[in-house]
């Protein structure tokens, strides 16, 4: 969870009222934070805020916390208002960036009065949003520049690796390749672009470099100081919705410091947009649902008042609430999310506890204990556990795995359930990247390896996780199966090394098994087999096909296996 430092004096300046340290401990709860530490430095009191919500990047700075508290205390109600003035600035996006880092969104914020604490919060917000929400700059990277040093129009273009500029913190030019090799940020984030044919570059009309997203800003325009009055904000990434949200978070935080927001026209090869877009989002909720789940006898008017203190605009109609909420939020997906805000405004400490009417005695789930035992076993074999997302997409599950499914479902076939021919897909996904539930785990491990090619080898991974399969006999038409997957990556890895770990698993769990040679496009022919226990095929083992490794951008050989855990579930776990 994000942690960051804030000044008590700065928070109180933004809220408009002073409080004791004890009062601040309670106030932080309105912003879904806990007060982790308090200390004094040069006569100033500082807090370490520990955010408890990874879906609210708008609360990861002093500006966001202060805004939330102002509304929660009733100093303001309803939607926060931000005006956007249209500028004549245009950013042109190069078509060559489509497969490199396709999306950039931009804004101008003018009239800032930046002191040292405001500058520290600006840098903190950049770093926390890019690190956590942006997954270490892979999905979101942020640049803030001194706009007075920039000459529009601006170009987000593909650059040759031999082009030069002075990176932030240096006083001499370096080529883009040299930056990735020698600059601290280049070594840290260069793996995100180093294998691309071109590198992204943001330049103005005079050819002056602003930044090399997502790695480093230029020294010329990318150093913001307390003397800076007008800034240009740049957000790049792979998902347009995600970079738009990050832009909304940053510009509204700067507006809390008195800045005036101006929009920028962004011209893509096949469409144009004006950014930022702060149009409020909409949602509807049944008031009786709120009352029932809250367990509180709240009137319609009380629910309305509580929601207005959480930055909603509320219209009551036919026992329902039509809601509009700020564009810097993207976490309202269900009525329960609205209920959470109602309870935060009401105050969890104000809810009277009740003793359960039915005495129950809990115990651990036996199958979960079995899964934990398997995890301990794998750690004992020297493997590192990873926990990846259940949500994925068809490309990752089939296309990148060299399987003939893609968009043509009729071409799919069942590779002894690794993977099955059918994929559970989401009807209206928020992002194409998260458009399906995975039906096998090896692609998730390869994705992890592809994101860590800059780390040392060998890399030996395992995951105990869920795969979702079609099952027409069930009410939901699906079933989630627990599986074990292992991936080994280093220059000398072989089928035998993976087989030795598989043998260790079977021996410790008390099972005899057989391997039967099989055909599977994800693996090298002749080096792949079915895992058979009690006459039933429960998994697959083999060396990953070079075409698959190339699809994932992995340069090391990989051996892997995957199997269902349920057939191995016996005493003493039953």
From Swiss-Prot:
Family matches, as Pfam families: B3_4, B5, tRNA_synthFbeta
E.C. no: 6.1.1.20
Subunit composition and interactions: Tetramer of two alpha and two beta subunits.
Annotated source species: Thermococcus kodakarensis (strain ATCC BAA-918 / JCM 12380 / KOD1)
Keywords, in A-Z order: Aminoacyl-tRNA synthetase, ATP-binding, Cytoplasm, Ligase, Magnesium, Metal-binding, Nucleotide-binding, Protein biosynthesis
Protein name: Phenylalanine--tRNA ligase beta subunit
Cofactor: Mg(2+)
One example GO MF annotation: RNA binding
Domain of life: Archaea
Residue ranges annotated for the B5 domain, each copy included: 278-353
Gene Ontology terms: cellular component: phenylalanine-tRNA ligase complex
Keyword Aminoacyl-tRNA synthetase included in the entry's annotation: yes
Temperature optimum or stability note: Optimum temperature is 95 degrees Celsius.
UniProt-listed SMART domains: B3_4 (SM00873), B5 (SM00874)
Residues that hold Mg(2+) according to the record: 331, 337, 340-341
Family as reported in the entry's similarity comment: Belongs to the phenylalanyl-tRNA synthetase beta subunit family. Type 2 subfamily.
Compartments, record wording: Cytoplasm
GO biological process: phenylalanyl-tRNA aminoacylation
Catalytic activity annotation: tRNA(Phe) + L-phenylalanine + ATP = L-phenylalanyl-tRNA(Phe) + AMP + diphosphate + H(+)
